[in-house]
């Protein structure tokens, strides 16, 4: 299953705040505003199309119209092919809002074709790039995109290292417990580590860091596993819906995986 390019109608149905051209009445008259649709049009000129959108809060007309939202872009011409045949698409994630509370921010991500799962890259080379609305220009955007693309060899090198590292059973358990700690925080939760480490698909079976990382990342972010909460109640973990939390969780998991690379 691949991601398809979203039309304006698709975007409006899933995250109408993305297409909002106005600004919140709470901002001052001096506030300089760059609507997200302008950024989308500029990204399309550079060959990057929208494949996913999300927004904070309700999607009803007028509700949260100016709140934070996330747009995921992909360029079909930019793709990473591994030696074992796996296809990974680099992505660019844009977060923005029309309430005057934040600049728009770009991050790098990866999309695994094998499981339609998205990862957020969290390295010194791929730190989030924030741009103020005031003074925005197409040339600045072009420079940001080119900068991210130029760093792709670093991503390929990192993914190759992930594939070369073989984890012991103890290390896999350690990784899973650390990931659960990131998901549930100090409150903790009783979870079957075996369930977290059990691959969803045959392609992810193995002891390579890359495979273990993807298995755990998918479970921790998408949920679906049983756990006992600190209250003693049995629950089923839900998928992370808040995209800000999802990005944060992904970044922390990526950093955790990197800690296993010598």
Q: Can you say where each PLM-predicted feature lies in the sequence?
A:
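Intrinsically disordered, low-complexity regulatory segments
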Residues: 1-34, 41, 45, 57, ...
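Intrinsically disordered, low-complexity regions enriched in serine/threonine
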Residues: 2-3, 77-262
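Functionally constrained cores in energy, signaling, and assembly domains
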Residues: 7-8, 12-13, 22-24, 42, ...
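A broad "ordered helical/assembly scaffold" signature
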Residues: 26-27, 53, 144
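Short amphipathic alpha-helical segments
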Residues: 31-39, 137-140, 144
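Amphipathic, interaction-prone secondary-structure segments
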Residues: 33-104, 246
